[in-house]
Amino acid sequence: MEPAAKTNPRMMRLGLPMTIDVWRNARIDFGATALFSLFNVVLNQFYVAFAIQEGASNVQVGLLTAAPAIGLLFSPIWASIMERSNNPKPFVILPNVIGRLLLLLPALFPTPSVYVAVAIVFQLLMGIQAPAYASLVSRIYPSDVRGRLMGYVRVSMGVLMIPLAYVVGNWSERFGPSGPLIAAAIAGTISIILFNSLHLPKQPPLQGAGGSKKARFSFKEQWSLVSGNRILALFLAATTLSGFGNMLSVPLYQIIQVEVLQLTNIQIGYTRVAYFAALLLTFLVAGWMIDRIDIRYTLLAGIGAYAVVPMLYGLWGTYPAVIVGNAVQGIGEAIWDIGIMAFVLRIAPGREAVVFGIHLLLFGIRGTLGPMLSTSLTTTVSLPLLLVVASLFGWAGTLLFYWGNRKQQL
C-alpha cells in the first residue's frame, strides 16, 4: 500500500485531506446513505408502531424489539468466517439486498405474524453484515479522517430523516403503512447496490491462519482478546449494563406512545423529528470529538443517555417527555453508532471484526432477554416501575465506565 499512497496525491475536500479514492468512496457513501434514509425511518421508527396498529400483542412487540438482538447472537461465528476470508464486502452486500426486499412482505400481507417473521429474518441477515461492516469501514476511510467522514455521512442522513419522519407519519396516517413499506424496500435496495461500487484497497494475504480453509469458530480465541485488555473488558461490561436497560425500555416506549398516550402517526412523526434532529447534531459533534479528544468522553455521554431516557418516560410519561426522550435517545444512538465502532477500530486494529462480533453477541443476549422480559412483566408490574429499573441499569453502566477508566491510558 505504500507505493499506492505515493502515487495518489491528497486533496482538500470537506476541510479534510484525502486521496482521490477516499473522496470517491465518500461521495458513494453519501449517495447510498441518502437513499437508505427512507428505509431507516420506516424500519427503525415506524415498523413497530405499524405492527401495533395492525393488532400486535405485547409479546409480539417484545419479539419485534428483540429481533435485532436475536440476529446478532450469531455474529461472532460470522465474524470468524469473514475475518479468515479477508473480504468483508460480500458479507455486507448480499444480506442487505435480501433483507431490504423483505420489507415488501408486510406491505402485501399486513398481519402481526408477518411483521414479526420479517423482522426476525431481516435481523438474522443483519447479524451477518454487522461485524463485516466494521471491518469494511476500516478499509473505506483512513483512521485520521474516519471519525469526521462517518459523522458527515450520518449528518446527511439525519438532515433527510427529519422531513422524512414527518412525511412517513402523514403518509401512513392517511393511506396506511403499505406505501411507506414498499417505498422503503425499493430505496433500501437501490442504496446497497450503489454502496457495492465502493473501491477498497488491496489487502495482503492472511498470514498463518490458512486463509479460508480454516474458518473455524473459537470462543476461546475471541474471548482471549478481552481477558488481556482491561479497557475492552470495561467497555463490554458497561455497554452490557446500559444496553440491557435500554433494551428493557424500548418496547415499553412503543406501548406508551401507542396504547397509553394513544398518539396518532402524525404525533409519532413529531417525536421522530426530535429524535433525528438530536441524532443529526450529535453525529456532527461526536465525529469532531472522536478525531480530536479521548474517545472515552464521547462514549460516556452515549452510555449515560440510555440511563436518562427511561427515567423521562417512567417519572413523567407525558407527550412532552416523549419528545425530549426521543431527542436524548437520538444522542445516545448516534454515539453508539459511530463512537463504538471508532473505539473498537482504535483498540483492536486488525481484529476489529472479531471484537465487534463479541460486542454484538453481548447485544444479542441482552437485546433478546430485555424486551421479552419487560413485555412479559407488563401485566403484573407497572410501566413506570419497569422504566425506573431500566434507568438504574443505565446508570450502573455509566458509573462503571467512568470509574473504571479514570486512570487508564488508551
What label would you give each PLM region?
Residues K6, H199-E221, Q409-L410:
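Flexible cytoplasmic inter-helical loops of multi-pass small-molecule transporters
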Residues K6-F74, W78-M82, I231-R272:
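Helix-loop boundary and gating motifs at the non-cytosolic
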Residues Q45-A49, Q53, S80, R84, ...:
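Transmembrane alpha-helix termini and helix-breaking/packing motifs in multi-pass membrane transporters
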Residues F74-N87, S172, T282-D294, T378:
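Helix-to-loop junctions at the C-terminal end of transmembrane segments
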Residues P90-L105, A185, Y297-L312, S391:
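Structural signature of the two symmetry-related core transmembrane helices
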Residues P106-A119, Y313-N326:
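Helix-loop junctions at membrane interfaces in 12-TM secondary transporters
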Residues I128-Y141, I335-A348:
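Intracellular juxtamembrane helix-capping segments at the cytosolic ends
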Residues G179-S197, L385-W403:
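Symmetry-related core transmembrane helices of the 12-TM Major Facilitator Superfamily/SLC fold
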